[in-house]
């Protein structure tokens, strides 16, 4: 029984790591799992798990080749929070750019527009999976970036 519970914890941790879309090698996944207390994990076990769950290497929003789960495993459900649709948030001197799951950009942009100027949002432009948003007067792009990060509980 204990072994089965430990296996479920391993699978849950493994899937959570892949959803982060930042691991470019099996060795990095092994180290991350070991850091979480799964001491007897090794590269061959990670390789079998990647195959079992259909994980693939693809480019993330930062154009890095990383392991991720296929889209059908990451499809949002009625109980999943909106923050799960936000994949990446970045900014430059003019705008904040938000990358979302395919098809989610307009929903997230509408949410941001509803917050309005009081929260520092002058407006948004959304495509299928990318949003440009610009700060209102009195706010810097960095202020807006940090506010959006906080809204979607992303790490700096």
Curated annotation (Swiss-Prot):
Pfam families for the chain: Arg_repressor, Arg_repressor_C
Give a yes or no for keyword Transcription regulation in this entry.
yes
What are the recorded GO MF terms, alphabetically? Answer: arginine binding; DNA binding; DNA-binding transcription factor activity
SUPFAM superfamilies under this entry? C-terminal domain of arginine repressor (SSF55252), Winged helix' DNA-binding domain (SSF46785)
Q: Which domain of life is it from?
A: Bacteria
Name its GO BP terms in alphabetical order: L-arginine biosynthetic process; protein complex oligomerization; regulation of arginine biosynthetic process
Q: In which pathway does it act?
A: Amino-acid biosynthesis; L-arginine biosynthesis [regulation]
Subcellular location(s) of the protein: Cytoplasm
Q: Name one GO cellular component term.
A: cytoplasm
Q: Which UniProt keywords apply?
A: Amino-acid biosynthesis, Arginine biosynthesis, Cytoplasm, DNA-binding, Repressor, Transcription, Transcription regulation
Q: Which NCBIfam families match?
A: argR_whole (TIGR01529), PRK05066.1 (NF003457)
What the record says about family reads:
Belongs to the ArgR family.
What is this protein's function? Regulates arginine biosynthesis genes.
Q: Can you name this protein?
A: Arginine repressor
Look up and give the organism this protein is from: Citrobacter koseri (strain ATCC BAA-895 / CDC 4225-83 / SGSC4696)
């Amino acid at each position: 029984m204990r072994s089965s519970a430990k296996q479920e914890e391993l699978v849950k941790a493994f899937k959570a790591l892949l959803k982060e879309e930042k691991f470019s090698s099996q060795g990095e996944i092994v180290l991350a799992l070991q850091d979480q207390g799964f001491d007897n994990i090794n590269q061959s076990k990670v390789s079998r798990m990647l195959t079992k769950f259909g994980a693939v290497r693809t480019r993330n929003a930062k154009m890095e080749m990383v392991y991720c789960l296929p889209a059908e495993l990451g499809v949002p459900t009625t109980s999943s929070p909106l923050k799960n649709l936000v994949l990446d948030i970045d900014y430059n001197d003019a705008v904040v750019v938000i990358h979302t799951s395919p098809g989610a950009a307009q929903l997230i942009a509408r949410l941001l527009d509803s917050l309005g100027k009081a929260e520092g949002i002058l407006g948004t432009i959304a495509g299928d999976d990318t949003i440009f948003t610009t700060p209102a007067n009195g706010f810097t792009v960095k202020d807006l970036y940090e506010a959006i990060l906080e809204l979607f509980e992303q790490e700096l």
